[in-house]
Amino acid sequence: MKLLAIDGNSILNRAYYGIRLLTNKNGVYTNAVLGFMNIYFKNFEEVKPDRVAVAFDLKAPTFRHKAVDTYKANRKGMPEELAQQLPIVKELLTYMGIRIVECEGYEADDILGTLSKVCSDSGGECCILTGDRDSLQLVNDRVTVRLATTKETIVYTPERFIEEYGFEPIYLIDLKSLMGDSSDNIPGVAGVGQKTAGALIKRWKTIESLYENIDGAELSKGVYNKLINGREDAIRSKWLATICLDVPVDYDIENYKISERNDEKLSDLLTELEMAKLMQKLGIEPSEKRASEKTVRAVDVKTQLKDIDEEILGGFLKMNSICYLFDGKAFKSAQRLDDENFITVSYTHLRAHETRRHL
């Protein structure tokens, strides 16, 4: 059993800034969608998971925001060009049969941590895909983190982490407790940087052990005073930096198997987004081609046109979003074919970004 757990917001954000702004002919931004899907497929092909979950943040404040009002208070809002692409990515994932996981009051990191624990406790292997180093604290013998960077994806195993940091992954929390994290507005201990914090954690592992032994720790006077004065900040910072492992989400890993793909909806949406290469990768045809090649409904020529309107067209006729297709050609109204036994009727609902068929 292998679960690929993806930090949706982090990967989408990285995809957005990694590709220049792109739009389709209708002005819909698509660069983040394209980048996200490229990153997804690359990692899916390398990991070869049999289960996939994509975690997203919600707009509602988390338990951290409620407890510490300065937490992430320095973050700017999501650019509108990116915000427009978030629901599109979620729609694509849904049509691809991939499980989306969200939980009010918690961050995507917490969901990833919880799923990785559930998976590893069940004897499975979890690969976390993210652009955020916070998740490195989750690395263990059954959990690896694939850190997406601008140039490459770095795979963190316990050995790789120790080689880089000099201590075990779980103590990354304590490192951040001392040095802080400006991106999340976690203060840490004022005046203690990464080098000093790293040396302290290599020796003492946890801030609890450090403070228990601080009087005999043979620290310089400056570092000693900073630690004493910043003790409360260190404790609060550790709490903020610790990923929650018991988020109330679906704990049944079987439910994260990829479900049946909806090729019709995928084709319609990807045609709208003008992503031909992605359609080719998925092995599906553009919706226009399918619409022109497929007889949607055969109606006996004796059937009155008004009956077809009432049954098939309904209120869509008033929205001016109807066209009839016959032999691959579109008409403003249905064509009566006296020399044939049937007519073919189809319609397009443009506002919903999809070609609909009434069978």
Regions found by a protein language model. Name each.
Residues 48-53, 98, 121, 141-144, ...:
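Non-catalytic nucleic-acid-binding/docking modules located in mid-to-C-terminal regions
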Residues 314-334:
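Gly/Thr-rich phosphate-binding beta-strand-loop-beta motif of the actin/hexokinase/Hsp70
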Residues 7, 54, 112, 132, ...:
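A residue-level signal for conserved active-site and pocket-lining positions in enzyme catalytic cores
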Residues 101-111, 288-314:
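Charged, flexible boundary elements
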Residues 1-129, 133-155, 159, 233-236, ...:
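Noncatalytic, basic helical substrate-engagement surface that gates or grips nucleic-acid strands
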Residues 348-355:
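Conserved small/polar residues in nucleotide/adenosyl-binding loops
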Residues 330-331, 337-346:
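Short, intrinsically disordered, charge-balanced linker/junction segments flanking boundaries
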